[in-house]
């Protein structure tokens, strides 16, 4: 016979899993939608994927954010067309090791760092933390592009520069939405 403490722990874990499963499924679906939805932008179309990755870190914290991103990554690795450009540009490992690999790897750091944002942070603190959070995605993306295509001005022109203002817009928008995200989170958890 289990003692009360052990039973309570098992009930808590079961409740946690029952809460996490739909969250993970929903969040990976939202990441996929954000990757597939192209916003017209010059010279390269942009997606809202970085916005969603940061929002997941903010909303669910580091641990759950990483778990969501790992699930999304594994879905893509096993051949589900969850990434931008899939299945047209390949699926699974062949897509992951393509031009976007560095960005995909950077998402893990970005979601983790976004999980550091607190409800009580002031707007400028939120913006600063989000800028710091997105930098690894672009650094790793830039490094990977340079490794596979060679180091030239084109990498900066196509792989980083076009997205700077778009990222600043997304970061500002998310920073303004953070209080609402935390309110919704508290409501859903109650």
Pin down the residues of each PLM region:
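Membrane-embedded alpha-helical hairpins and interfacial helices in multi-pass inner-membrane proteins
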Residues: 120-190
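Hydrophobic transmembrane alpha-helices
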Residues: 1-66
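Helix-loop junctions at the membrane-solvent interface of multi-pass transporters
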Residues: 33, 37, 59, 86, ...
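Interfacial aromatic-anchored transmembrane helix boundaries in multi-pass membrane proteins
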Residues: 35-45, 73-110
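Structural signal for the C-terminal ends of transmembrane alpha-helices
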Residues: 59-63, 113-119, 181-186
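Juxtamembrane membrane-interface segments at transmembrane alpha-helix termini
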Residues: 57-59, 63, 79-85, 142, ...
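Alpha-helical transmembrane segments in multi-pass membrane proteins
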Residues: 23-31, 53, 57, 68-76, ...
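Residue-level signature of transmembrane alpha-helical entry/exit and packing/kink sites
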Residues: 16-24, 49-53, 64-65, 95, ...
């Amino acid at each position: 016979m289990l003692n009360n403490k052990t039973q309570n722990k098992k009930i808590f874990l079961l409740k946690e899993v029952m809460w996490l499963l739909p969250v993970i499924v929903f969040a990976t679906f939202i990441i996929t939608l954000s990757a597939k939805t192209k916003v017209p932008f010059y010279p390269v179309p942009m997606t809202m994927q970085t916005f969603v990755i940061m929002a997941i870190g903010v909303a669910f914290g580091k641990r759950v954010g990483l778990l969501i991103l790992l699930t999304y990554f594994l879905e893509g690795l096993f051949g589900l067309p969850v990434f931008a450009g899939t299945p047209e540009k390949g699926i699974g490992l062949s897509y992951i090791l393509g031009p976007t690999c560095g960005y995909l790897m950077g998402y893990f750091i970005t979601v983790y760092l976004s999980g550091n944002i607190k409800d009580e942070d002031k707007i400028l603190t939120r913006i600063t933390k989000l800028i710091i959070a997105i930098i690894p995605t672009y650094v790793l993306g830039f490094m990977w592009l340079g490794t596979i295509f060679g180091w030239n001005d084109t990498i900066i022109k196509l792989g980083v520069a076009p997205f700077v203002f778009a990222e600043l817009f997304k970061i500002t928008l998310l920073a303004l939405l953070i209080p609402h995200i935390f309110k919704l989170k508290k409501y859903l958890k109650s």
